[in-house]
Amino acid sequence: MSHSLHHTDAADTAKLLQELDRDSKSRSLTGGYKTAMTVLFVLYSLTMIVMALVVSGATQYTRLPVFVGMTLFVGYLKYPASKRDALRDNFFPWYDIVLAFASLGVFFYYAIEQKRIIQMANRIGTTQIVLGIIGILLLVELCRRSTGIPLIVVVGLFTVYGAWWLTNNNPKTALRNLIYNLFYNLNCGIFSSPITVCASFIVLFIILGSFLEKTGIGTFFVDLANSIAGASVGGPAKVAVISSALEGMYSGSSVANTVGSGSITIPTMKKVGYKPEFAAAVEAAASTGGQIMPPIMGAAAFLMAEITGIPYASIVVAAILPAVLYFTGIFLMVHFEGKRLGLKGLPKDSIPHFFRLLAKSGYLLIPVVILVICMNYYTAGMSACFAILFSLIISLIGRDKHDLVRTIGLPLIPLAVLVVLWQVIKIDTGTAVFVSMVVAVLCSFLTRSAILSPRLVAEGLQGGAGSSIGVAVACAMAGIISGVVSMTALGTTLVAVIVPLAQKSIFLALFCTMLACIVLGMGVPTTANYVIMATITAPILIKMGIPLLAAHMFVFYFGIVADITPPVALAAYAGSAIAHSNPLKTGITATKLAIGAFIIPYIFALNPSLLFIDVESVWALIGIMVTSIIGMAGIAMGMTGHVYAHVPWYMRIMLLAGGIFLIDPSPVSDLIGLLLIGIPFAFQLLQNRKLKATAAE
């Protein structure tokens, strides 16, 4: 890494995650307890990989209860009941042990007795009702520990509504039907589409992200961004934007991304002259955008594929242009703020050479390339497994130039095994990939010069398992919400009531949906937020004429920006803790920087060509991109108050208004927007030339 980039202490980073990221709020373990927990996490991740590759033919009645049961088991061992318990080293109270094994018992009972339960259908007996209630309560308690109270409140309200609806229809069977639908029915409830997607795809991508992090790709991305923009105006802030966008490809957590890259970029931004609030806000805004950055988007994107029936690969393609616009907006804000403050870039001699860096470390991108290629031919889960395999393979590349046999030869062994098993012997793809993974791990015992080692493999699997628990719990809880909506036809009722009221104003419907997503996102994880909004508000937007993908992308975007929207802006708070800035001011500044996230969804909702939907021509798409970028530039200039020099207040209003007019895709609004932006820009340009001419004389 370039020596110009200073970072905070690793212990400080861990402490920040412990405070702000619930996935890091685990027990304090040392010695044998820590080793035992690591073994459990490794077994958990291995089970997920084996279920995806080797025993993929198992029925959902087996896979899903086993997955949820194991998740709750390790979850109760990871997350203590209270902050007081978390402060005590190696403390496992008896009730946590009981809850952990009770989780295994209840959910494994379902897997073992699946045939009997299927035959019973909604005529389940007292035993099944009691076990179902216990299973739901176990999930709720772990949700309290791992995700927080707000999601429980939301789920509780929906459950009460479901119970009331069933009681009105038939009081005698209300409890039985409620438990059956929420716990045993695979079409709604805990085991519905959210947890199915989590078990099939999301966990595998989380494990992939953990392995990519271990390869050192994060450091490579920071250096790559530094080589691209480090020497330009406000270079360190631009480095933060680019590196966070790249890191977002494998990090699904805004907070973790902010803390991880922010520990490097924020101190550097402060050093060159950026205010602490601005430095923290840049990192928070860019890191939050990581969840919309293809090819590995946030967990909610996989749920979108399942709910809409649109292939994940198509969603990734549709997300490209909005992501480009989002980060372009932040980049322009940073650029004009840097010009306003007169900030220069980093010294050129401290910046890595772009092509030398690619030649040295470009191979770290191979797993990402493999992932993109595989998505065109295989399921998302299988594609993730291929990428995990190649993460292991590239990690076998040695750093000892004098031992070429091991440096180059070892990575070729698992690759050769894959080719022979898959293409020569013709065994099934999943088994071939799994055996090749095992061979790669065995090869790690034969070298000390490579990144890959048995310890790194264990850490990668452990990290993937630890990060999966909170997401899986949120998916299971979200399933309860979607189950109630499906069971009671609440979604259809809301569409019938709201659409006529909002028919006259599509902007009003979009604005109300935006507010609902942001408010809900302040207390509910992105995954659950998306499921709730996709179940309730997306159908309303679709009924009003917005295309399916555009409606779901709209709620997806606004569920994410809650991480930087005050008063509950966890990513902004994480950045402020590193920068030692005011958290509220940081959140407000981050919201200003990420203004694109509040504008872009309106653009693709009103003109879905931005998502490659019904594109009239390539030129029409280029026109949308150009006007959108000009609009983002106008807003950036208006908000920073600087183009070539200070911009008067009335011109700032013109620039902001011009950017807003360019949201509407009609030719008239585009012309007005271009004029409103063009006049102040031309005035600034002419004034700047006069000043230069005067200075030259």
Stretch-by-stretch model annotation:
Residues 1-122, 129-133:
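Conserved, well-structured core domains of diverse proteins
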Residues 2-37, 42, 317-466, 570-660, ...:
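Long, contiguous bundles of hydrophobic transmembrane helices that form the permeation core
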Residues 51-56, 77-89, 116-117, 135-149, ...:
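Membrane-water interface regions at transmembrane-helix termini and the short interhelical loops
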Residues 100-105, 113-116, 124, 129-184:
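Hydrophobic or amphipathic alpha-helical targeting/insertion segments
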Residues 126-130, 188-201, 227-241, 272-278, ...:
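Membrane-interfacial loop-to-helix junctions in multi-pass transporters
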Residues 141, 145-146, 150, 154-168, ...:
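Core transmembrane alpha-helical segments of multi-pass membrane transporters/permeases
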Residues 209-213, 244-253, 285-291, 482, ...:
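Transmembrane alpha-helix interface/packing and boundary motifs in multi-pass membrane proteins
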Residues 222-290, 296-303, 309, 526-558, ...:
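Hydrophobic transmembrane alpha-helices that form the pore/transport pathway of multi-pass ion
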